[in-house]
């Protein structure tokens, strides 16, 4: 298993340095051939490039993030047209920043906090005032939209997220309330935006603090399993809810554990997904997402197994490309997710005291690495 992991890790670094470090965000097939009409997807930039500052290559990510500045007026107009403050980052777009029409993409929101997360990774790799000066304006404007998008539920005395299609795209925008990954991401990114205000010498936004304090906890069922959304009460009975991305695992994995989540319920959820998920309907980045969740929950054997699970969409060809199907023989978000997961499994995260937390402690693994940084 170690030899195959090394092969995938080495080849992925080359493939991503060539194809996921340009002046604009990469499309999912990089420069090899066109996918989705040559458009790129902003919810994928985290998967393509979050690994770069964690592996000591911040300059690659900062090069791409310059593009966000050029399309800020377009993103601001998207938010204004929809009645929101701040800027709303597009889902599917091109170098010009024009939003591509879509009955799904226009309702996605998980691309929104990515800019805050990626800017924070750049700051952590180089905690210099110049980084704050360079990115803080867009961090704050991104957070303004996030606050405006959340709805205050006076009856429940809480903030909710609705009117969106989650990362698990099998759910409806019109009925979905409080998808778990997006809730956790809102909690994380709004906190980071406040920290950036303090780093810039500004006061915390009290309204944002109220959102952070009153954001809804993740919804669960009577078996202690987290739901695909608060309204998705049939999550574990309807195959629509157990196909596509198991985004609930991203709530802890991509993101750190937080007060919205019970660790025991998340462990229950991981085990159920492990045993029962419709793995034939997954994508390449679902496996590193599962590995990161398992790592943070203290399940290193599952972390390794997730990265090497014998499924079609977790296939890595001799050239290192993450094969999905005959249409998508190249899928770089899978490669990027692999490198991010390996960074977490080796270097851990803030407050982690376990050496190489993503690898089993059975005496069979001798893990050596250098130059990796912990995740938040």
Please state what every model-predicted region is.
Residues 1-39, 58, 68-76:
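Acidic/polar, glycine-enriched structural segments that form the non-catalytic walls/loops
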Residues 2, 24-37, 71-72, 121-129, ...:
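Primarily short, surface-exposed interaction patches in extracytoplasmic proteins
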Residues 6-18, 112-120, 137, 141-146:
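Extended, hydrophobic/aromatic-rich amphipathic alpha-helical segments that build helical scaffolds
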Residues 18-28, 51, 62-64, 149-152:
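Short, solvent-exposed loop/turn and secondary-structure capping segments
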Residues 38-77, 93-98, 104-125, 129-137, ...:
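Active-site core of glycosidic bond-cleaving carbohydrate-active enzymes
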Residues 90-101, 168-175:
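Aromatic- and acidic-residue-enriched carbohydrate-binding clefts of CAZyme catalytic domains
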Residues 141, 145-196:
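Acidic/histidine-rich catalytic neighborhood
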Residues 356-376:
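Surface beta-strand/loop "capping" patches
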């Amino acid at each position: 298993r170690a030899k195959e992991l090394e092969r995938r890790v080495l080849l992925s670094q080359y493939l991503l340095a060539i194809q996921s470090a340009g002046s604009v965000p990469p499309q999912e097939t990089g420069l090899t051939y066109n996918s989705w009409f040559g458009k790129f997807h902003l919810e994928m930039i985290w998967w393509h490039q979050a690994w770069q500052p964690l592996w000591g290559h911040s300059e690659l990510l900062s090069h791409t993030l310059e593009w966000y500045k050029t399309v800020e007026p377009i993103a601001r107009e998207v938010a204004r047209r929809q009645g929101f403050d701040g800027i709303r980052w597009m889902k599917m777009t091109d170098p010009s920043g024009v939003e591509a029409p879509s009955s799904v993409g226009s309702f996605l929101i998980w691309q929104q906090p990515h800019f805050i997360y990626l800017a924070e990774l750049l700051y952590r790799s180089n905690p210099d005032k110049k980084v704050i000066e360079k990115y803080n304006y867009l961090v704050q404007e991104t957070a303004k939209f996030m606050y405006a998008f959340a709805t205050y539920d006076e009856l429940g005395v809480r903030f909710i997220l609705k009117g969106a299609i989650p990362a698990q795209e099998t759910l409806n925008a019109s009925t979905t309330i409080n998808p778990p990954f997006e809730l956790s991401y809102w909690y994380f990114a709004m906190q980071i935006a406040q920290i950036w205000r303090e780093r810039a010498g500004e006061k915390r936004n009290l309204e944002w603090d109220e959102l952070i304090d009153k954001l809804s906890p993740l919804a669960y069922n009577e078996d202690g399993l987290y739901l695909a959304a608060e309204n998705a009460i049939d999550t574990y009975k309807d195959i629509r809810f157990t196909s596509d991305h198991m985004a609930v695992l991203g709530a802890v994995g991509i993101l750190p554990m937080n007060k919205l989540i019970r660790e025991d319920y998340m462990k229950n959820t991981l085990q159920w997904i492990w045993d029962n998920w419709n793995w034939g309907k997954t994508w390449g980045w679902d496996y590193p997402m599962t590995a990161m969740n398992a790592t943070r929950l203290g399940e290193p054997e599952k972390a390794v197994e997730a990265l090497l699970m014998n499924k079609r969409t977790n296939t890595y060809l001799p050239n290192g490309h993450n094969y999905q199907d005959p249409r998508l023989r190249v899928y770089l978000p899978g490669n990027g997710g692999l490198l991010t997961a390996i960074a977490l499994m080796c270097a851990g995260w803030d407050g982690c005291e376990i050496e190489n937390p993503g690898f089993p402690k059975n005496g069979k693994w001798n893990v050596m690495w250098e130059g990796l940084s912990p995740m938040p």
